[in-house]
Swiss-Prot record:
Disruption phenotype: No visible phenotype. Voz1 and voz2 double mutant displays a late flowering phenotype under long-day conditions. Residues 208-405 are annotated as: VOZ. This is Transcription factor VOZ1. The gene is VOZ1. The VOZ region includes a DNA-binding domain and a dimerization domain. Contains an atypical zinc-finger followed by a basic region structurally related to the NAC domain. Transcriptional activator acting positively in the phytochrome B signaling pathway. Functions redundantly with VOZ2 to promote flowering downstream of phytochrome B (phyB). Down-regulates 'FLOWERING LOCUS C' (FLC) and up-regulates 'FLOWERING LOCUS T' (FT). Binds to the 38-bp cis-acting region of the AVP1 gene. Interacts with phyB in the cytoplasm and is translocated to the nucleus at signal transmission, where it is subjected to degradation in a phytochrome-dependent manner. GO terms for cellular component: cytoplasm; nucleus. Coiled coil: none annotated.
């Protein structure tokens, strides 16, 4: 009886000791779990990882201690897992489960066939540009679905090793036969006979220096060399070929550039030569745009909405050469809606290096004091059916006298000067003196009296020098009081 009681007391004391130890460990575990909860709320990933490892380590030690074949073990003495509380059982079961930090990596799933570079054969290029799927129904295939390229290419970079350019895009990828790059409705470009290798497009990015000595791109404002491919042989790229075809058909408005064209004459003569050769250059043909009526009366062709801080605007278009510009000694072209006034030639340049002529015209008189209209005509010797015109509208200082328009004071002074010139033309007889006073034929330039103010003389000379009227001319003056100097 005594032995049984002592055995019971020993078992009770051992159980109490184990219970107290378990209680302390549960308290420690509860504190760690609270710290872990706060660390997650405060977004401290380092502390979260450390606390999770401590919790797992504690549970592993506890489980190892319980499984030891020791007399002090409650399980060894007949205790079962069911004798523990539900919380301890749940923790012991969680310890048996492997978490993400300690579990082994699962076998990776096989990648799709289109992401394998060896099996897919440049699938990124096919998926991004859709060049092998067939001809595009919406124009240029190089533009369609371009937004998916970065996403598709990103799936092929795993960070293990850098991929070479030819490994990604497979330079031996071929287009389907008869691929014309979206120019299905452009008979002038024709179609491609046979496949085109993508490696042929690499020189378009950075052509060699020698290429710039050959023919340039036919687009009027592009100085890059033409590549010579079958379906855009006169252009540097398919994009410029599309621009030249779509921006220059008949019926379109002239090319407009707020701020000016900003190109030298060489590119403009090159565009004219390309047009004469039957190429599309991106400049429309506008028949009579500069000569049928005044440009300020043609809003359907010339937009005159001046932008903020804009001081110059230019238009560019093709038209038939107007030989009427050279009619008469004054080389002028009257406009039907401007009371017989219009364009006056001020300069003619023989451009030997380009094989053509450049003529400059000014509007006489200018319609406004603070705006000036100028017209430039480009012609080449080998083409008589087409000329290139550059129309210019320029904001000038209103205080300065506008070119091509003489102030009223200057006209009045010149009328007085003409009245003092009778001494240079003596009357033939007394009977015809009265008639000749009303009607005289004055040849050559009028000589200004030395008594006239020098300011008016300088103003008149500047007008003559500016517009290049250097030859002799005849005026038939009917009434000196109505004489008008244009």
């Amino acid at each position: 009886m005594t032995g049984k009681r002592s055995k019971t007391n020993c078992r009770s004391a051992s159980h109490k000791l184990f219970k107290d130890k378990a209680k302390n460990r549960v308290d420690d575990l509860q504190g760690m779990l609270l710290d872990l909860q706060f660390a997650r709320k405060e977004s401290r990933p380092t502390d979260v990882t450390l606390l999770e490892e401590q919790v797992n380590q504690m549970l592993r030690e506890w489980k190892s201690e319980l499984n030891e074949p020791s007399p002090a073990s409650s399980l060894q003495q007949g205790g079962t897992l069911g004798s523990f509380s539900s919380d301890i059982c749940r923790l012991l079961q969680l310890c048996d489960e492997e978490d993400d930090a300690t579990s082994k990596l699962a076998a990776p799933k096989p990648e799709p066939a289109d992401q394998n570079l060896e099996a897919g054969k440049a699938a990124v290029f096919q998926r991004g540009y859709n060049l092998v799927q067939g001809k595009s129904e919406h124009g240029l295939p190089l533009v369609d679905n371009c937004k998916d390229l970065s996403l598709a290419a990103g799936n092929n970079f795993d960070g293990t090793a850098p991929l070479e350019y030819h490994q990604q895009y497979d330079l031996q990828q071929e287009f389907e036969p008869n691929f014309n790059g979206g120019f299905n409705n452009c008979p002038s470009y024709g179609v491609v006979e046979g496949p085109i290798h993508i490696s042929n497009f690499i020189p378009t990015i950075c052509p060699p220096p020698s290429a710039f000595l050959g023919p340039k791109c036919a687009l009027w404002d592009c100085p890059r060399p033409a590549q010579g491919f079958d379906w855009f042989q006169d252009y540097c790229s398919s994009f410029h070929a599309a621009l030249a075809f779509n921006e220059g058909p008949p019926g379109m408005n002239p090319v407009v550039r707020p701020g000016g064209i900003g190109l030298k004459d060489g590119l403009l003569f090159a565009a004219l030569s390309a047009k004469a050769g039957g190429k599309d250059v991106g400049i429309p043909e506008c028949e009579g745009a500069a000569t049928a009526k005044s440009p300020w009366n043609a809003p359907e062709l010339f937009d005159l909405t001046v932008l903020e801080s804009e001081t110059l605007r230019e238009w560019l278009f093709f038209d038939k050469p107007r030989r009427a510009f050279e009619s008469g000694n004054r080389k002028q072209r009257s406009l039907p809606d401007y009371n017989g006034r219009g364009w006056h030639e001020s300069r003619k340049q023989i451009m030997v290096e380009f094989g053509g002529l450049k003529r400059s015209y000014y509007m006489d008189p200018q319609p406004l004091h603070h705006f000036e209209w100028h017209l430039y005509e480009y012609e080449i010797n080998k083409c008589d059916a087409c000329a290139l015109y550059r129309l210019e509208l320029k904001l000038v200082d209103g205080k300065k006298t506008s070119k091509g328009k003489v102030s009223n004071d200057s006209v009045a002074d010149l009328q007085k000067q003409m009245g003092r010139l009778t001494a240079e033309f003596p009357p033939e007889n007394n009977t015809t003196n009265t008639t000749n006073n009303n009607k005289r034929c004055i040849k050559g330039r009028p000589k200004v009296s030395t008594k006239v103010a020098t300011g008016n003389v300088q103003n008149t000379v500047e007008q003559a020098n500016d517009y290049g009227v250097g030859e002799e001319f005849n005026y038939l003056v009917g009434n000196l009081s109505d004489y008008y100097i244009p």
